[in-house]
């Protein structure tokens, strides 16, 4: 199957349309007030797509709030980006969960593998971000860590990905998909066509 591409931090309908025209599979909408890319459910609902799935990114909300926002924003998936546990995933529903983990926060590969195994039964996708929490900070990670773990569900790689490092990331980590954000922006929340096109060229799609 071809590589899945998610572009996160949608703040305008124009950017969403541009991403779809380029062939993006997932559009990410961030629901986190301290983020420069924060939006509300009404905006997410107003973005109509032609095949791309809409993903809500949640950090501090309760499971009830996540479910309500999924409904009100007409979102397909909840990306749980705040350390939510298995019970939280169950409440939202496995079929709608993209669970985020941060490989760099673990002291050993064994610990990292244990958390992968813990969440696999409760999500449709895993997403691995750089740093030890949060996201959208433009920091990349060491890709070699993925050679030492087994990931039995489709997974996406995030964290400072751009045209400059995408090829290395794909060749080394071999993910099922990538999550682009700050590396394809001219400023926080504003996607840049040239950077997106360069990223797609690097991916080979």
UniProtKB/Swiss-Prot annotation:
Keywords: Amino-acid biosynthesis, Aromatic amino acid biosynthesis, Isomerase, Tryptophan biosynthesis. Signal peptide: none annotated. This is N-(5'-phosphoribosyl)anthranilate isomerase. Disulfide bonds: none annotated. CDD domains: PRAI. It comes from Maridesulfovibrio salexigens (strain ATCC 14822 / DSM 2638 / NCIMB 8403 / VKM B-1763) (Desulfovibrio salexigens). The keyword Transcription does not apply. It catalyses: N-(5-phospho-beta-D-ribosyl)anthranilate = 1-(2-carboxyphenylamino)-1-deoxy-D-ribulose 5-phosphate. InterPro entries: Aldolase_TIM, PRAI_dom, RibuloseP-bd_barrel, TrpF_fam. One of its GO terms (biological process) is L-tryptophan biosynthetic process. Belongs to the TrpF family. The gene is trpF.
